[in-house]
């Protein structure tokens, strides 16, 4: 195995020693892992090239029963530039080439006919042109305080992830009153698709706070073209 980590020391110490020896003998530059990771997007194609060379070696040499490989280029470039951009199309083409090379390796190894290929992603992308900042509204209502980019005091806060946000109310004594107030205010924000209370969490596959203490007190969903930001800076909620 080779772990999916940046740090060179961990990358090598947690890898199978005999595999590292084989890769070095083949001239695959595993010593570049951390250097290329630190380069950000500029190092993504190099990393995918190296990971594919490693996969080819494992397939042709060891004929594994199962092999998983993480290609990073498409995710990184679409995060940086959005969908339907020249960079995104280039990244998709690059990853297509890497998948083709892996398939060709199974043919070379004589296991193609008995191999199932699964190409999957952990998430998709939606292009947005506006950001909703629920923590700005919470700050304006006196429910949190910030110092520069940092939130330093909070009675409530929003944890955001793309087109969704989870609002946690930490003021237990006034939780119901605050939840009702925030529900009404969040509904009025342009770009807000839904403000969901715990009684309706089943509709989005979310456990209630009673079922899981890590669950939020309100769940927010953005309309197409909008994304959530966790920033509490500024005066504009959108």
Regions found by a protein language model. Give the residues of each.
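His/Asp/Glu-rich, glycine-adjacent segments
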Residues: 1-82, 187, 194, 229
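Short secondary-structure boundary/capping segments
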Residues: 2-4, 83-86, 132-138, 234-237
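Extracellular/periplasmic catalytic domains that process cell-envelope and extracellular macromolecules
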Residues: 59-63, 110-113, 158-161, 211-214
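Structural recognition of the beta-strand scaffold that forms the well-ordered cores
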Residues: 66-70, 117-119, 166-168, 219-221
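Extracytoplasmic/secreted cell-surface and envelope-processing proteins
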Residues: 77-79, 127-130, 176-178, 229-231
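Active-site-proximal segments of metal-dependent phosphoesterases and phosphodiesterases across multiple
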Residues: 81-96
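Metal-dependent active-site segment of extracytoplasmic phospho-/sulfohydrolases and closely related
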Residues: 94-138
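Active-site neighborhoods of enzymes that stabilize oxyanions during catalysis
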Residues: 152-238
